[in-house]
Amino acid sequence: LGRVDHQDAYLDYDNQERERGITIYSKEAHFHWKDSEIYLIDTPGHVDFSSEMERSLQVLDLAILLINGQDGIQSHTSTIWKCLKHYKIPTLIFINKMDISYKTQEELMNDLKTHFSSNCINFKSEDAEDELSMLNEDIMNHYLETEEIDSSLLQQAIFKRECFPVFFGSALKIQGIEDLMDAIIDLSFIQDYPEDFGARVYKISSDDQGNRLTHVKITGGVLNAKDKVGTDEKVDQIRLYNGKQFEMVQTAYPGMICALKGLNKYEVGQGLGFESDLSLIHI
């Protein structure tokens, strides 16, 4: 298990990150959990690197807002929350370091409901089902008829930002992590992607050989290695990164986060295919 204070966190491999013990650059990873494939972007939480975090928001299907249980909601936490609202990103909340926090779950939930939304709900509490049943009329009617929360209606409510599931635990002690991972799978709204090709650029980087990499999320259709993008550029390689390591694939499908080698003209926020360009809000 990698630890920031041991300078061996899997995604914080940059020398500056290991020296300072914080995330500076957004990183990608992908993995399987219970027959589902998850594409993860780990972003900085420090206020000095807000722009790096914001660039990643535009390609997220779901955000996990990580809050230190010792500190609770800080001013920068509220800023990130406003960004998530601006980009209309469905959000789960994980309260970390509960093994050493002097605050109770009830105290932290009161803070979340006061500062963020009354629809922040502790999914492991005894009152969770009652709170969920009152999210909207459709969920309530189904609950009154069946005494169960309809999973598809709940997914839609989370997708529409009508509900913000909250989980508590400790990453270091591996407490609450399985509940969070299950929630990512069970509560995510499955999107339908168009058949036409589209992608969104969220990051530009260079590899160890100095090759320019254009990091994108595929939002429709498929992209093959050697395909032309735009009028005069060709994708030489499609890379799937896991931290510092990567594998090359022949085809990228909708929902994938990948890095494209061979493109030199695209910048952060630009769209490929049917996607239009976006402007960032610059927090």
Name every feature range the model reports, one short phrase each.
Residues 21, 42, 56, 64, ...:
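Residue-level signature of catalytic and energy-coupling elements of molecular machines
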Residues 41, 67, 169, 216-219, ...:
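Surface-exposed loop and edge beta-strand positions of immunoglobulin-like domains
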Residues 69-208, 227-229, 258:
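P-loop NTPase catalytic nucleotide-binding module
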